[in-house]
Swiss-Prot record:
Transmembrane segments: none annotated. It comes from the Bacteria. Belongs to the UPF0262 family. The lineage of its organism: Bacteria, Pseudomonadati, Pseudomonadota, Alphaproteobacteria, Rhodobacterales. HAMAP family: UPF0262 (MF_00678). This is UPF0262 protein RSKD131_1985. InterPro entries: UCP032146.
Length: 158
């Protein structure tokens, strides 16, 4: 079964995440574990590793690290992605999320809806960038990419 069965966020930031960021993280992990599609392609003439997988996301030396293990915790892969392609979309996503959280407190539903539509658009762009960067390393569907992008944002800013 090619899916993620466990996810861990290796967060080494000395600053604890805000309540909103922690909530986003918990929801993304719950949704991701409920439904996801994650497969590793065949590489270097070897058959692809079979899931379910345990995934640890981390930032090390300025790179996004995917540490992938079997359900029995045997290492089946690790790859590193440059954070460069994510920087602007992560920054935009956090700015729009801040606006959204503030809007929910004081604006009418029509204005909240407009901000939420913009937030979803930026989130979709982040998922697209992630799918593109994962090409040849891991195969994910768009919903899995969206949830992983949320976790990357939390890791990046949390």
């Amino acid at each position: 079964m090619n899916r993620i069965c466990h996810i861990e966020i290796d967060q080494t930031s000395p600053i604890p995440p805000t309540a909103e960021i922690e909530q986003e993280r918990q929801v993304a992990i719950f949704d991701l574990l409920e439904e996801n599609s994650f497969a590793l392609p065949a590489r270097e003439g070897r058959a692809p590793a079979e899931g379910p997988f345990r995934l640890t996301l981390a930032i090390r030396e300025g790179r996004l690290v995917f540490d992938i293990r079997s359900e029995e915790e045997e290492k089946v892969g690790e790859f590193h992605l440059s954070l460069g392609p994510f920087r602007q979309v992560v920054k935009d996503y956090f700015h729009i999320c801040e606006s959204y959280f503030e809007a929910v407190k004081r604006l009418p539903p029509s204005q909240i809806e407009a901000i939420d539509m913009a937030r979803r658009g930026i989130h979709n762009e982040g998922a697209r960038v992630l799918k593109e960067r994962l090409e040849g390393k891991a195969e994910v569907d768009i919903d899995t990419a969206r949830r992983l992008f949320t976790l990357i944002c939390v890791l990046h800013w949390g």
